[in-house]
Protein backbone atom coordinates (compact mmCIF):
# COMPACT_ATOMS: atom_id res chain seq x y z
CA UNK A 1 0.00 0.00 0.00
CA UNK A 2 2.80 2.41 0.89
CA UNK A 3 4.67 1.47 -2.26
CA UNK A 4 1.65 2.19 -4.40
CA UNK A 5 1.31 5.69 -2.92
CA UNK A 6 4.98 6.39 -3.54
CA UNK A 7 4.66 5.29 -7.15
CA UNK A 8 1.66 7.53 -7.74
CA UNK A 9 3.38 10.51 -6.13
CA UNK A 10 6.49 9.99 -8.17
CA UNK A 11 4.41 9.72 -11.33
CA UNK A 12 2.61 12.88 -10.48
CA UNK A 13 5.89 14.64 -9.80
CA UNK A 14 7.24 13.39 -13.12
CA UNK A 15 4.18 14.69 -14.95
CA UNK A 16 4.62 18.03 -13.28
CA UNK A 17 8.21 18.16 -14.46
CA UNK A 18 7.13 17.34 -18.02
CA UNK A 19 4.50 20.05 -17.94
CA UNK A 20 7.06 22.53 -16.64
CA UNK A 21 9.48 21.61 -19.40
CA UNK A 22 6.77 21.92 -22.05
CA UNK A 23 5.68 25.26 -20.64
CA UNK A 24 9.25 26.51 -20.60
CA UNK A 25 9.74 25.35 -24.18
CA UNK A 26 6.60 27.07 -25.34
CA UNK A 27 7.60 30.24 -23.55
CA UNK A 28 11.05 30.24 -25.10
CA UNK A 29 9.63 29.62 -28.55
CA UNK A 30 7.19 32.48 -28.03
CA UNK A 31 10.06 34.72 -27.04
CA UNK A 32 12.03 33.68 -30.10
CA UNK A 33 9.02 34.20 -32.34
CA UNK A 34 8.27 37.61 -30.90
CA UNK A 35 11.87 38.68 -31.21
CA UNK A 36 11.93 37.41 -34.78
CA UNK A 37 8.76 39.30 -35.57
CA UNK A 38 10.11 42.48 -34.02
CA UNK A 39 13.33 42.13 -35.98
CA UNK A 40 11.39 41.63 -39.21
CA UNK A 41 9.26 44.66 -38.43
CA UNK A 42 12.33 46.76 -37.73
CA UNK A 43 13.92 45.61 -40.97
CA UNK A 44 10.83 46.44 -42.98
CA UNK A 45 10.58 49.90 -41.44
CA UNK A 46 14.24 50.52 -42.17
CA UNK A 47 13.82 49.50 -45.80
CA UNK A 48 10.76 51.70 -46.13
CA UNK A 49 12.62 54.63 -44.64
CA UNK A 50 15.44 54.11 -47.10
CA UNK A 51 13.02 53.93 -50.01
CA UNK A 52 11.15 57.04 -48.94
CA UNK A 53 14.43 58.88 -48.44
CA UNK A 54 15.54 57.94 -51.93
CA UNK A 55 12.25 59.11 -53.39
CA UNK A 56 12.52 62.38 -51.52
CA UNK A 57 16.03 62.90 -52.82
CA UNK A 58 14.89 62.21 -56.38
CA UNK A 59 11.97 64.60 -56.06
CA UNK A 60 14.25 67.29 -54.65
CA UNK A 61 16.61 66.91 -57.58
CA UNK A 62 13.73 67.22 -60.01
CA UNK A 63 12.44 70.32 -58.23
CA UNK A 64 15.84 71.97 -58.27
CA UNK A 65 16.31 71.44 -62.01
CA UNK A 66 12.65 72.36 -62.75
CA UNK A 67 12.42 69.42 -65.10
CA UNK A 68 14.69 70.85 -67.83
CA UNK A 69 14.45 67.68 -69.90
CA UNK A 70 10.88 68.69 -70.83
CA UNK A 71 12.28 71.12 -73.41
CA UNK A 72 12.01 69.74 -76.90
CA UNK A 73 15.29 69.17 -78.74
CA UNK A 74 17.36 69.71 -75.57
CA UNK A 75 19.41 67.21 -73.58
CA UNK A 76 21.97 67.43 -70.80
CA UNK A 77 25.59 66.39 -71.05
CA UNK A 78 27.32 64.48 -68.26
CA UNK A 79 29.42 67.54 -67.36
CA UNK A 80 26.38 69.79 -66.92
CA UNK A 81 26.11 71.58 -70.26
CA UNK A 82 23.00 71.60 -72.42
CA UNK A 83 23.00 70.72 -76.10
CA UNK A 84 20.39 71.56 -78.69
CA UNK A 85 19.72 69.78 -81.97
CA UNK A 86 16.89 69.19 -84.41
CA UNK A 87 16.17 66.49 -86.93
CA UNK A 88 16.13 67.52 -90.56
CA UNK A 89 12.82 66.87 -92.34
CA UNK A 90 12.61 63.53 -94.16
CA UNK A 91 16.14 62.67 -93.02
CA UNK A 92 17.75 60.72 -90.21
CA UNK A 93 20.48 63.30 -89.71
CA UNK A 94 20.30 66.10 -87.16
CA UNK A 95 21.39 69.72 -87.25
CA UNK A 96 23.69 70.56 -84.37
CA UNK A 97 22.61 73.85 -82.79
CA UNK A 98 25.30 74.23 -80.13
CA UNK A 99 26.15 73.65 -76.47
CA UNK A 100 24.87 76.15 -73.89
CA UNK A 101 25.18 76.69 -70.13
CA UNK A 102 21.41 76.66 -69.50
CA UNK A 103 18.51 74.63 -70.77
CA UNK A 104 16.54 77.76 -71.68
CA UNK A 105 19.24 78.96 -74.06
CA UNK A 106 19.30 75.58 -75.79
CA UNK A 107 15.50 75.63 -75.98
CA UNK A 108 15.48 79.03 -77.72
CA UNK A 109 18.04 77.76 -80.21
CA UNK A 110 15.76 74.82 -80.98
CA UNK A 111 12.77 77.14 -81.50
CA UNK A 112 14.64 79.14 -84.14
CA UNK A 113 15.50 75.98 -86.04
CA UNK A 114 11.95 74.65 -85.72
CA UNK A 115 10.50 77.85 -87.20
CA UNK A 116 13.01 77.80 -90.05
CA UNK A 117 12.44 74.14 -90.94
CA UNK A 118 8.78 73.51 -90.08
CA UNK A 119 7.30 76.99 -90.09
CA UNK A 120 4.28 77.75 -87.94
CA UNK A 121 3.52 74.04 -87.58
CA UNK A 122 6.73 73.46 -85.61
CA UNK A 123 6.55 72.67 -81.90
CA UNK A 124 8.07 75.52 -79.87
CA UNK A 125 9.35 75.59 -76.32
CA UNK A 126 8.52 79.31 -76.02
CA UNK A 127 5.61 80.05 -78.38
CA UNK A 128 5.24 83.54 -76.89
CA UNK A 129 8.62 84.47 -78.43
CA UNK A 130 7.82 83.22 -81.94
CA UNK A 131 7.48 86.74 -83.32
CA UNK A 132 10.69 87.96 -81.68
CA UNK A 133 13.13 85.19 -82.57
CA UNK A 134 15.67 85.93 -85.31
CA UNK A 135 15.16 84.29 -88.68
CA UNK A 136 17.98 82.63 -90.64
CA UNK A 137 18.95 84.04 -94.01
CA UNK A 138 18.28 80.66 -95.63
CA UNK A 139 17.37 77.11 -94.63
CA UNK A 140 20.95 75.90 -94.85
CA UNK A 141 22.31 74.31 -91.65
CA UNK A 142 24.98 76.99 -91.35
CA UNK A 143 22.50 79.87 -91.42
CA UNK A 144 20.17 78.05 -89.04
CA UNK A 145 23.02 77.51 -86.59
CA UNK A 146 23.96 81.20 -86.73
CA UNK A 147 20.39 82.34 -86.04
CA UNK A 148 20.01 79.76 -83.26
CA UNK A 149 23.18 80.96 -81.55
CA UNK A 150 21.99 84.57 -81.78
CA UNK A 151 18.65 83.68 -80.18
CA UNK A 152 20.27 81.62 -77.43
CA UNK A 153 22.71 84.38 -76.44
CA UNK A 154 20.08 87.14 -76.41
CA UNK A 155 19.44 88.48 -72.92
CA UNK A 156 16.48 90.79 -73.52
CA UNK A 157 13.56 90.67 -75.89
CA UNK A 158 11.82 93.74 -77.31
CA UNK A 159 8.95 93.86 -79.71
CA UNK A 160 10.03 95.22 -83.09
CA UNK A 161 7.70 98.23 -83.00
CA UNK A 162 8.35 101.96 -83.14
CA UNK A 163 8.22 103.89 -79.90
CA UNK A 164 4.74 105.29 -79.24
CA UNK A 165 5.93 108.89 -79.01
CA UNK A 166 7.88 108.54 -82.24
CA UNK A 167 4.89 106.90 -83.90
CA UNK A 168 2.64 109.77 -82.78
CA UNK A 169 5.14 112.31 -84.12
CA UNK A 170 5.36 110.47 -87.42
CA UNK A 171 1.59 110.31 -87.67
CA UNK A 172 1.33 114.04 -86.90
CA UNK A 173 3.93 114.93 -89.53
CA UNK A 174 2.20 112.70 -92.06
CA UNK A 175 -1.10 114.42 -91.34
CA UNK A 176 0.53 117.83 -91.76
CA UNK A 177 2.13 116.86 -95.04
CA UNK A 178 -1.19 115.47 -96.26
CA UNK A 179 -3.00 118.66 -95.24
CA UNK A 180 -0.36 120.81 -96.93
CA UNK A 181 -0.57 118.81 -100.12
CA UNK A 182 -4.37 119.08 -100.03
CA UNK A 183 -4.15 122.86 -99.48
CA UNK A 184 -1.68 123.21 -102.35
CA UNK A 185 -3.95 121.20 -104.60
CA UNK A 186 -6.94 123.35 -103.62
CA UNK A 187 -4.94 126.54 -104.25
CA UNK A 188 -3.82 125.34 -107.65
CA UNK A 189 -7.36 124.30 -108.50
CA UNK A 190 -8.83 127.64 -107.40
CA UNK A 191 -6.12 129.53 -109.28
CA UNK A 192 -6.86 127.56 -112.39
CA UNK A 193 -10.57 128.17 -111.90
CA UNK A 194 -9.99 131.93 -111.45
CA UNK A 195 -7.84 132.09 -114.54
CA UNK A 196 -10.44 130.15 -116.48
CA UNK A 197 -13.22 132.45 -115.23
CA UNK A 198 -11.29 135.62 -116.13
CA UNK A 199 -10.44 134.18 -119.54
CA UNK A 200 -14.11 133.37 -120.17
CA UNK A 201 -15.10 136.88 -119.04
CA UNK A 202 -12.59 138.51 -121.35
CA UNK A 203 -13.72 136.38 -124.25
CA UNK A 204 -17.36 137.33 -123.53
CA UNK A 205 -16.42 141.02 -123.44
CA UNK A 206 -14.52 140.65 -126.69
CA UNK A 207 -17.57 139.02 -128.20
CA UNK A 208 -19.73 141.95 -127.10
CA UNK A 209 -17.31 144.60 -128.34
CA UNK A 210 -16.64 142.76 -131.57
CA UNK A 211 -20.24 143.18 -132.73
CA UNK A 212 -20.53 144.89 -136.13
CA UNK A 213 -21.07 148.66 -136.12
CA UNK A 214 -24.78 149.11 -136.45
CA UNK A 215 -24.39 152.80 -137.24
CA UNK A 216 -22.30 152.45 -140.35
CA UNK A 217 -23.76 153.82 -143.54
CA UNK A 218 -24.13 150.43 -145.07
CA UNK A 219 -26.10 148.95 -142.21
CA UNK A 220 -28.31 151.87 -141.30
CA UNK A 221 -31.87 151.94 -142.52
CA UNK A 222 -32.66 155.26 -144.24
CA UNK A 223 -36.21 155.08 -142.96
CA UNK A 224 -35.02 154.88 -139.35
CA UNK A 225 -36.06 157.73 -137.09
CA UNK A 226 -32.44 158.50 -136.39
CA UNK A 227 -31.86 159.33 -140.08
CA UNK A 228 -34.10 162.40 -140.36
CA UNK A 229 -31.21 164.64 -141.29
CA UNK A 230 -29.66 162.49 -143.97
CA UNK A 231 -27.90 160.37 -141.45
CA UNK A 232 -26.75 163.28 -139.36
CA UNK A 233 -27.70 164.36 -135.88
CA UNK A 234 -26.18 166.79 -133.46
CA UNK A 235 -25.65 166.94 -129.75
CA UNK A 236 -25.73 170.29 -128.04
CA UNK A 237 -24.07 170.95 -124.74
CA UNK A 238 -25.96 173.30 -122.45
CA UNK A 239 -24.83 175.13 -119.41
CA UNK A 240 -23.35 173.66 -116.32
CA UNK A 241 -26.75 173.62 -114.66
CA UNK A 242 -27.97 170.97 -117.04
CA UNK A 243 -27.38 167.45 -115.99
CA UNK A 244 -26.47 165.96 -119.34
CA UNK A 245 -26.58 166.30 -123.05
CA UNK A 246 -29.60 167.19 -125.08
CA UNK A 247 -30.41 165.76 -128.44
CA UNK A 248 -31.24 168.53 -130.89
CA UNK A 249 -33.92 167.42 -133.26
CA UNK A 250 -33.83 168.89 -136.77
CA UNK A 251 -36.66 171.09 -137.93
CA UNK A 252 -38.38 170.81 -141.21
CA UNK A 253 -37.57 174.35 -142.19
CA UNK A 254 -33.86 173.49 -142.17
CA UNK A 255 -34.38 171.17 -145.11
CA UNK A 256 -35.90 173.90 -147.30
From Swiss-Prot:
One of its GO terms (cellular component) is nucleus. It is found in: Nucleus. PROSITE patterns: AP2_ERF. GO terms for molecular function: DNA-binding transcription factor activity; transcription cis-regulatory region binding. Residues 33-42, 186-197 have a biased composition (Low complexity). Residues 70-127 bind DNA. This is Ethylene-responsive transcription factor ERF035. Belongs to the AP2/ERF transcription factor family. ERF subfamily. Keywords: Activator, DNA-binding, Ethylene signaling pathway, Nucleus, Transcription, Transcription regulation. Disulfide bonds: none annotated. Coiled coil: none annotated. Probably acts as a transcriptional activator. Binds to the GCC-box pathogenesis-related promoter element. May be involved in the regulation of gene expression by stress factors and by components of stress signal transduction pathways. Transmembrane segments: none annotated. GO terms for biological process: ethylene-activated signaling pathway. Residues 33-72, 186-205 are annotated as: Disordered. The keyword Transcription applies.
Amino acid sequence: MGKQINIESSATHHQDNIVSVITATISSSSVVTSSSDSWSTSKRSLVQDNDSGGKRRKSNVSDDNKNPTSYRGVRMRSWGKWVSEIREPRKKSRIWLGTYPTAEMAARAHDVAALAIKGNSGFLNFPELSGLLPRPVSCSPKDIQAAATKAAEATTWHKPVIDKKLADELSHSELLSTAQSSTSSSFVFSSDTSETSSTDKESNEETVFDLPDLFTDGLMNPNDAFCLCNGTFTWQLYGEEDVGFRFEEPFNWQND
